[in-house]
C-alpha cells in the first residue's frame, strides 16, 4: 500500500468480522474478501425525536439529501469510538458511550450493483444536549433538525431521505 497524505485508512475484516491485519485506503477498490466497518448513528432525544442532517450541496454522495450521522470506522478504532467521532465531526455533538447501544449489525456485499463490502453497525444514542453545527469539524452537513417518525417518513416519501436508511421504520423506531 502506497502512502497517501491525509488519506482515510481503514482496517480490513473478513466476513466474520475478524481483523485481517491489512489496511485499506478509502476510495480504492476493496478486495473481494475484505470488509470495512461502518456506523450509522441515530441520535434520539427524550421527546422521541431523532437528529437528522441534510448533506451539504458539495458532498459527493447524496447532496442535499437527509440522513442520520454515519461513516467509516478508521484504522485502530472500534465501532463505538467511530460512532462517537462521526457524531462530533458531522453534527458537533459529544455523545456519551454509556448512552449508546448497537441495535443491529448487517454485512453488506453489493448495493445497487456497487461492491460495498462493509459491516454496518447501527447505533442509537440518547441525547438531550445542545446541537451546534459550529462545533462540527467537517462541512459535510448543511443543516440539522430534530424530527419525529412522521416527519422523517414525509422526507423519505418525497425522495429527500437517503433510501438505504429505510430500515429506520422497522429497526430503529419500532
Named regions from a protein language model:
Residues 12, 43, 52, 124-125, ...:
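Conserved hydrophobic "DFG−1" position in protein kinase catalytic cores
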Residues 51-52, 68-102:
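The catalytic Nudix box helix
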Residues 1-40, 44-46:
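Acidic, metal-coordinating catalytic segment for phosphate/diphosphate chemistry
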Residues 37, 47, 57, 88, ...:
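Active-site segment of metal-dependent pyrophosphate-handling enzymes
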Residues 19, 27, 63-64, 75, ...:
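Nudix hydrolase/Nudix homology domain
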Amino acid at each position: 500500500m502506497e502512502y497517501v497524505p491525509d488519506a482515510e485508512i481503514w482496517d480490513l475484516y473478513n466476513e466474520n468480522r475478524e481483523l485481517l491485519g491489512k489496511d485499506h485506503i478509502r476510495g480504492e477498490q476493496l478486495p473481494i474478501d475484505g470488509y470495512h466497518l461502518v456506523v450509522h448513528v441515530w441520535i434520539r432525544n427524550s421527546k422521541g425525536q431523532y437528529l437528522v442532517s441534510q448533506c451539504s450541496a458539495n458532498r459527493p454522495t447524496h447532496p442535499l439529501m437527509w440522513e442520520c450521522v454515519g461513516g467509516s470506522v478508521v484504522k485502530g478504532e472500534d465501532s463505538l469510538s467511530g460512532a462517537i467521532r462521526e457524531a462530533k465531526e458531522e453534527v458537533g455533538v459529544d455523545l456519551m458511550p454509556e448512552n449508546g447501544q448497537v441495535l443491529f449489525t448487517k454485512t453488506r456485499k453489493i448495493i445497487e450493483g456497487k461492491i460495498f463490502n462493509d459491516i454496518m453497525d447501527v447505533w442509537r444514542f440518547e441525547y438531550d444536549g445542545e446541537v451546534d453545527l459550529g462545533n462540527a469539524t467537517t462541512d459535510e452537513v448543511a443543516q440539522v433538525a430534530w424530527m419525529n417518525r412522521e416527519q422523517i417518513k414525509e422526507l423519505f416519501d418525497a425522495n429527500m431521505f437517503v433510501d438505504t436508511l429505510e430500515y429506520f421504520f422497522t429497526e430503529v423506531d419500532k
